[in-house]
Regions:
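A helix-coil-helix interface module used to build multimeric assemblies
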Residues: 1-157, 161-170, 176
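Short, intrinsically disordered, charge-balanced linker/junction segments flanking boundaries
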Residues: 3, 179-185
Length: 185
């Protein structure tokens, strides 16, 4: 809505009214959804009921998928950030323990049976390397899911300018989908 008003597609007054009045009530959404049988239409109707006259611009040019997919991307990105943070803590602790136990003897294993002695520190160093790869995979996964798709029905930008998608993506620290469709593939 903000970029639509900047582009002159909707009145600036409407964008301000939407920003100031938009809110929702989960219980009301549930009641509306029971009638409409569509979760996102129920959400739109509920938010619109609080906005007033400018509500006609609230969902202008976008599809439910534009909003739902982009929201899901944000959730995935935020989840990945939590996992990455925790993996870094795990790595730090494994490294500390590996150094502490660099001379702690333990039995090695090969093919599931006892083998030559190794140190517990070596075993932990191996775990450290594995978790470091997991951290890199998680960073890559975060990058892959950090996608914004605001391209309108069937992803053709017929009802919304691509600059809106770029604007929203920048605001949300997401990338845009390279080949747009109605949903993020």
């Amino acid at each position: 809505v903000e970029k639509l008003s900047i582009n002159g597609v909707i009145p600036k007054k409407a964008a301000k009214e939407i920003r100031n009045k938009a809110k929702f009530n989960v219980k009301e959404i549930e009641l509306i959804e029971n009638k409409t049988k569509h979760d996102f239409i129920a959400y739109i109707n509920n938010v619109s009921s609080y906005i007033g006259e400018s509500a006609k611009y609230f969902h202008h040019g976008v599809t439910s998928s534009d909003i739902i997919d982009t929201s899901f991307s944000i959730q995935l990105k935020q989840s990945a950030e939590i996992i990455i943070k925790e993996l870094k803590l795990v790595l730090k602790e494994i490294k500390i323990k590996a150094i502490k136990h660099k001379n702690t003897i333990m039995i090695g294993r090969s093919h599931g049976i006892h083998a030559e002695p190794i140190t517990f520190g070596l075993k932990l160093a191996s775990f450290y390397c594995e978790f470091k790869r997991n951290l890199n995979r998680m960073k890559s996964a975060k990058d892959e899911v950090s996608i914004c798709a605001i391209s309108g029905p069937v992803g053709t930008y017929n009802s919304i300018d691509p600059s809106v998608e770029k604007y929203v993506a920048a605001k949300l620290d997401l990338k845009t989908e390279n080949v747009s469709t109605q949903v993020i593939p």
